[in-house]
Amino acid sequence: MADNMTTTQIEVGPGATNATINFEAGILECYERLSWQRALDYPGQDRLNRLKRKLESRIKTHNKSEPESKRMSLEERKAIGIKMMKVLLFMNPSAGVEGFEPDCMKNPSNSNCPNCNWADYPPTPGKYLDDIEEVPENVDDPTEIVLRDMNNKDARQKIKEEVNTQKEGKFRLTIKRDIRNVLSLRVLVNGTFLKHPNGDKSLSTLHRLNAYDQSGRLVAKLVATDDLTVEDEEDGHRILNSLFERFNEGHSKPIRAAETAVGVLSQFGQEHRLSPEEGDN
């Protein structure tokens, strides 16, 4: 990672995870009610579908780590999420979500409690969805693969060989490659490996793929969690497409960002993470 790049890793406990999932489920319920009333435009409908897929997958994963008695369905979480919204929006502004109340709620004897308002609890930088993993997080002993001036076949093989040496857990992959002798991009990838009983390893999650120019400026990013979304910045589509055209043998015409993502994920057997709906957008 370039010297001028820093990264902050945010640790969130299971209580906060439950609160976040429940709140997002409440947001989904609001989206669905708008949809029933035909009040959503096409981008809004797309966000509804993406949020629903993400929540269903995240809840399924989260429930595996919870005792059976604490596991909740999406519908149960929607109900809790709506209650959270009512608490946050319509009750005393100092009211907080259970387990995360402001100090004045935990200690009613606090003399400042009557004057408590949201201004006393400013947003915490870096804890919004758009801010998380803006730069892939630091990983101990990250793998760096240099693919400069390599042909497609050799590049594919080198990626597979290097990645297969990774241990179970998180990793970071840095790919450096010249594009048409004009632009040198650095691509950072975060992911998590799982080791199977038979000894095989697979990439269970691709958390984020970022592309930077020579000055370290973020020019494009692919975000892939439980579903895949494609976000472009400036001419990120064109640059990222150019980068991965080299990996698509026999592909003479420019490829779209969605197809690029499929090409990257296919190296790890993750084609299914791009839905047909997203492939059309």
From Swiss-Prot:
Renumbered ranges of motif Nuclear localization signal: 50-55
Region (RNA-binding and homodimerization) location: 1-93
Primary location: host cell
GO MF: protein serine/threonine kinase inhibitor activity; RNA binding
GO cellular component, one term: host cell nucleus
Protein keywords: Host cytoplasm, Host nucleus, Host-virus interaction, Inhibition of host innate immune response by virus, Inhibition of host interferon signaling pathway by virus, Inhibition of host ISG15 by virus, Inhibition of host PKR by virus, Interferon antiviral system evasion, RNA-binding, Viral immunoevasion
Positions of region (G1P2-binding): 1-103
GO BP, one annotated term: symbiont-mediated suppression of host type I interferon-mediated signaling pathway
Compartments, as annotated in UniProt: Host cytoplasm; Host nucleus
Highest taxon listed in the record's lineage: Viruses
Keyword Aminoacyl-tRNA synthetase carried by entry: no
Keyword ATP-binding recorded: no
Family to which the UniProt record says this protein belongs: Belongs to the influenza B viruses NS1 family.
Known partners and oligomeric status: Homodimer. Interacts with and inhibits human G1P2 conjugation by UBE1L.
Function according to Swiss-Prot or TrEMBL: Binds and inhibits the conjugation of the ubiquitin-like G1P2/ISG15 protein to its target proteins. Since G1P2/ISG15 is an early antiviral protein, NS1 may inhibit the host antiviral response. Prevents EIF2AK2/PKR activation, either by binding double strand RNA or by interacting directly with EIF2AK2/PKR. Also binds poly(A) and U6 snRNA.
Listed name of the protein: Non-structural protein 1
Taxonomic source organism: Influenza B virus (strain B/GA/1986)
